[in-house]
Swiss-Prot record:
Keywords: Phosphoprotein, Repeat, RNA-binding
The protein, known as: Uncharacterized RNA-binding protein C23E6.01c
Biased composition (Polar residues): 20-39, 55-68, 453-467
Residues bearing PTM Phosphoserine: S64
Stored InterPro entries: Nucleotide-bd_a/b_plait_sf, RBD_domain_sf, RBM42_RBP45_47-like, RRM_dom
Biological processes annotated in GO: mRNA splice site recognition
One Pfam family cited in the UniProt record for this chain: RRM_1
Gene3D superfamilies the record matches: 3.30.70.330
Signal peptide limits: none
SMART domains for the chain: RRM (SM00360)
Organism: Schizosaccharomyces pombe (strain 972 / ATCC 24843)
Amino acid sequence: MSSSPTESEILPKESHNSIDEQSQQPANTDTLVKDNSFNEQDDQEVDNDYKSNDEPVQSQDPISPNMASNESGNSENTSNYGSSRDENVYQKTTLWMGELEPWVTEAFIQQVWNTLGKAVKVKLIRNRYTGMNAGYCFVEFASPHEASSAMSMNNKPIPGTNHLFKLNWASGGGLREKSISKASEYSIFVGDLSPNVNEFDVYSLFASRYNSCKSAKIMTDPQTNVSRGYGFVRFTDENDQKSALAEMQGQICGDRPIRVGLATPKSKAHVFSPVNVVPVSMPPVGFYSAAQPVPQFADTANSTVFVGGLSKFVSEEELKYLFQNFGEIVYVKIPPGKGCGFVQFVNRQSAEIAINQLQGYPLGNSRIRLSWGRNQNPIAAPALNYQSQVSQTTIPATSLFPAMSLPPQAQFSPYPAVAPSPLALQTRGAPIGMEISIGSPALVPDQMHIPENGNSDTMPVPNTQGKHLSAEE
C-alpha cells in the first residue's frame, strides 16, 4: 500500500516557500474546457427546484421572474398586477432589481422610486423559511417609457445608500401569477464561476444574447450562502440552449472564463437527502469520479485532506470557502507553484465527507483530486501516539500474511492494537521480553534490561530504535 502524500514531503520543515520538486506528482492540468457535458444528477447538491415542482429548500432563490408568483414567503395579493395587459407590453413595464441588502423592504424600494419621480408597484421576493428578502424584487412601472427611463439608473447610486442599482428587464411572469410548464424549459450547467460573481452577472451575460433566457441560479451553501462556484441557466427555447452550449464555452464572466455543459432534466436527477449529507458508509456520490475510499487500516487520528490538481488561480481563501461547509478547519496550505494543497479539519468525519463529496469538483480551470494527507499539527489524543509511531515502518510480508503499512486497529481486526507489554512472556524464537501473537505485530526493542533471575518488578525499558517482527520471526 503506497503512502499518502504528506505536507512534510512538499513543504520543508524550515520553510514553506522551499519546495522539493521530486516530492510532489505533477498537478492535474486537464482543463474543463473540452468537456461539454454535465449531468445534473452528478452534482452533490442539485437544487430541489431543478428536480421537482417543489419550492427550493434553504437556498437563495434564482433570478427568475417566473418563479416570483410561486414564492410562498410573500403573501400579498399581486395576482392582478398587469393582468389585462398584453404580454409584450408587460415585459416592457417590469424590471428586475437585485443585489438587495437583507434590511431592504418593499416600502423602502417604493420610496426610492417615488423619490426619483416614478410611481411603481413592488413585489419583494422572500425566503420562505427565514422571511428575509431573497436579494431581489420586481418593480412594475406605469408605462414602458417609465420602465425604459428607469433602466438608465442601472449601476448608479441608490439614493440614501452607498449601493448601486442592479436592474434588468424581467423576462416574463414578474408580478403576475403565471404558470409555465417546466417541461418546456431547457437548462445548462455553468461552472468555474468566480466567488465574486452573482446571479445577476450570470443572468445578464446570457440574457443579453438569448431572448429565451429566463433564470440563472448559483448554487450556494444553505447555511453560509457562500457560492459553490457553479450554477444553472434556464431557457424556454431549445435552440437558445443549444446555441449557448456552442457559443458560451470559455466566455468571461467576472474575471474568469466559464465552462458550460448540458444539464440532465430534473426528472432524471437524483434526489438527495434533505440535509444534503451522504453517510460515509454509503457509496460515494462525487462529482466526476469515484470518491477516495478510506483505507482499511486508516489512522483514526488523521483529519488532513490532500488536494491535488489545483489551478494556479485558486487561493487559500477560496479553498477554505469550499471546504468549510463540511466542518471546522484547523488550517489551509497551498504550496506555491505545486498545484496542490492541504486542508486539516478538527474532526476526521468532516474530512471523510469532504473527500467523498468533493472528489473531482471543478475548481478554477481544473478538477481537484482528493486523498488522505497526514496531520502536521496533531490534535488527536495521546493514546494514538503509538499507532502513529508504528505507521512509520512497514511490516515485512510473510508467507501467511501480506505486508501492512499500519497495524490492525480494533475496529478492523479481532485483535486490539498492542503496545509492548510490561510483563511480556518469553517465546521460543522471539527476543526475550516480548510476546508475539498472530495479527498483533509488536514493537520489539533492540536492548532490554532484564535481571539475571529473569524476574523484574519494573517494566523493561526499550531502546528508542525499534524494529518490527512478523509472526514467523
